[in-house]
């Protein structure tokens, strides 16, 4: 039974801001979530990425020695470098999918063709271990390099 009206939305564009590259950062300002990186919501990564960013913030805030101090550049830079590592994975996954459509505008990642080819091979595999590892990567439980182990490569390409 329909419980309400059906609503559609349009996603205008993905944006990533590289705060980790700033030489100076406004003291006392914290930037997280979509303010740093807004990817296509179709992939459902926003909350997970924001939670991982919050953990990176907690790690960096623990480095502040006195309670009540504002966030000095000495903390801001390591924090943004930490979240850049988180965003690299999310961004590559989401943008890589977006760019398979010809209507997507912008500069394709250098690794697009190779990543797309490999992802297609992983998706075509009928090996349950490959599928399990793929979903662990997609849900940020494991880094993408876990799909590149000799065992996973064998299971992806040789075992059908």
Residue ranges of model-derived segments:
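FAD/FMN-dependent oxidoreductases across multiple families
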Residues: 1-78, 82-86
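C-terminal helical "tail/cap" subdomain of flavin- and related membrane-associated enzymes
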Residues: 58-160
């Amino acid at each position: 039974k329909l419980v309400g009206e059906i609503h559609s939305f349009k996603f205008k564009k993905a944006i990533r801001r590289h705060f980790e590259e700033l030489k100076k950062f406004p003291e006392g300002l914290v930037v997280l979530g979509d303010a740093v990186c807004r990817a296509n919501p179709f992939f459902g990564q926003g909350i997970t990425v924001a939670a991982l960013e919050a953990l990176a913030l907690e790690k960096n805030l623990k480095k502040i020695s006195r309670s009540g101090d504002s966030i000095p550049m000495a903390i801001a830079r390591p924090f943004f470098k930490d979240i850049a590592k988180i965003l690299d994975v999310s961004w590559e996954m989401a943008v890589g999918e977006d760019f398979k459509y010809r209507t997507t505008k912008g500069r394709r990642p250098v690794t697009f063709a190779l990543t797309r080819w490999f992802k297609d091979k992983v998706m075509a595999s009928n090996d349950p271990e490959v599928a399990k590892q793929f979903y662990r990567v997609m849900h940020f439980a494991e880094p993408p390099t876990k799909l590149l182990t000799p065992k996973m490569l064998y299971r992806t390409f040789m075992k059908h």
